[in-house]
Amino acid sequence: MFGLGGQPQLSSQQKLSAAEAELDLVTDMFNKLVDNCHKKCIEQIYNDGQLNKNESTCIDRCVAKYFETNVKVGENMQQLGQAFSPGKF
């Protein structure tokens, strides 16, 4: 408030740019998840148009591990960011 000690207010353009960057990151993460889990869990030669039980289970586990890893990496990055933030030196 009044520029004293608070977060600076972002302009509409800055908010839009931040939202676009976040959308790009989420889209990239989704595409990597699909690509990695597809390569790991689904044979290159399809015998059936539907996923079989093994493929479905593999994909479920792959996606769960991918998100769990993403959360852990995010938490570690946040801790590192706080440790090296200005005023900590």
Curated annotation (Swiss-Prot):
Gene Ontology MF, one: metal ion binding
Motif Twin CX3C motif per UniProt: ranges: 37-62
Lineage top rank: taxon: Eukaryota
Membrane topology: Peripheral membrane protein
The entry's keywords: Chaperone, Disulfide bond, Membrane, Metal-binding, Mitochondrion, Mitochondrion inner membrane, Protein transport, Translocation, Transport, Zinc
One GO-annotated biological process of the protein: protein insertion into mitochondrial inner membrane
Subcellular location field: Mitochondrion inner membrane
Subunit structure: Heterohexamer; composed of 3 copies of TIM9 and 3 copies of TIM10, named soluble 70 kDa complex. Associates directly with the TIM22 complex, whose core is composed of TIM22 and TIM54. Interacts with the transmembrane regions of multi-pass transmembrane proteins in transit.
Listed name of the protein: Mitochondrial import inner membrane translocase subunit TIM10
Gene of this entry: TIM10
